[in-house]
């Protein structure tokens, strides 16, 4: 594939593997062009043989594409907590008295949404010869819902107020609700506490979308390592490219914690990464090179970070050594 040169790659199951190397050396070709293709129905086969694939249940490419295809999608809908929030509002005495069920609190439902903005909280303005733009809906004041729906309040807050909360605020507000609090706390721990839970997905950065996807995987449920080893169940393979882009040091530390949690749950994680802090946390490193283009596509060194750091030919080794020394 591209510039890969008949290499043999070993990726330990249930561990964190980081693929390193200079730009253009074959990192993406290895991950997207080979590893991801192994699990496709009609793969573009670029390998001679592969083993161990049956130990993997699903392969997920956790990229930086948007978390939703419409302006209505948001963190709360993507991580599935909005369903729980709607049920909570529907159980309130006033809601039951008025015959409101959980669907009433969906901003996609005509009976509950603001008739002016159709549940968006914003109005799309079509501009001649200019890109379309969005403006605040004055009818609902950006709350998305009609007055009757907004009149139902949980601890003094309407469903519109809840969607306007930041993840930090919502985690505290729903502290008594285990499932909601756990998911919101995970989002908070990955450095996303400043986002509104109802923030439209098109306004999120690629890095924010990627971390939301990682948290979603963490909420799917824990897999017993004993079950995996005894072949009673299979774990997933997660392929993640450059997740540290645009992150501050503290957020990188939070990202590392998320990657370790996936591994602790029995999954296999493969990351293409340039950040030495993440390299140093790997169980296994595959260092590609030695150069880019036709002079790349080979494995320069493979193994634990300490082994790769001592390589005489690796362009990554000096930087990794410095990171390991702290």
Task: Report the location of each language-model feature.
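Conserved phosphate-binding elements of NTP-dependent enzyme cores
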Residues: 1-326
């Amino acid at each position: 594939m591209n510039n890969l040169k008949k290499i043999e790659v070993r990726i330990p199951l249930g561990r964190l593997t980081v693929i390193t190397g200079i730009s253009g050396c074959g990192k993406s070709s290895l991950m997207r062009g080979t590893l991801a293709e192994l699990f496709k129905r009609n793969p573009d086969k670029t390998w001679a043989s592969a083993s161990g694939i049956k130990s993997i249940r699903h392969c997920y490419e956790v990229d930086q594409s948007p978390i939703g295809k419409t302006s209505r999608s948001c963190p709360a809908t993507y991580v599935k907590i909005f369903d729980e929030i709607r049920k909570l509002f529907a159980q309130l005495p006033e809601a039951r008295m008025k015959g409101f069920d959980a669907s009433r609190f969906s901003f996609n439902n005509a009976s509950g949404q603001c008739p002016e903005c159709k549940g968006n909280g914003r109005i799309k303005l079509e501009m001649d010869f200019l890109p379309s733009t969005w403006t605040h809906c004055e009818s609902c004041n950006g709350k998305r819902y009609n007055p009757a729906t907004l009149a139902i309040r949980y601890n003094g807050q309407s469903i519109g107020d809840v969607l306007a909360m930041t993840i930090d605020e919502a985690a505290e507000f729903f502290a008594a609700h285990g499932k909601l609090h756990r998911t919101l706390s995970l989002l908070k721990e990955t450095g996303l506490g400043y986002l509104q839970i109802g923030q439209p997905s098109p306004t999120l950065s690629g890095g924010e979308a990627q971390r939301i996807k990682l948290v979603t995987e963490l909420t799917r449920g824990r897999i017993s390592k004993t079950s995996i080893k005894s072949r009673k169940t299979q774990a997933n393979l997660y392929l993640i490219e450059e997740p540290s882009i645009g992150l501050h040091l503290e957020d990188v530390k939070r990202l590392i914690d998320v990657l370790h949690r996936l591994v602790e749950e029995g999954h296999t994680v493969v990351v293409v990464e340039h950040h030495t802090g993440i390299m140093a946390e790997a169980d296994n490193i595959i260092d590609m090179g030695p150069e880019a283009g036709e002079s790349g596509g080979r494995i320069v060194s493979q193994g634990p970070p300490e082994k790769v750091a001592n390589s005489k030919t690796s362009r990554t080794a000096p930087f990794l050594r410095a990171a390991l020394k702290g």
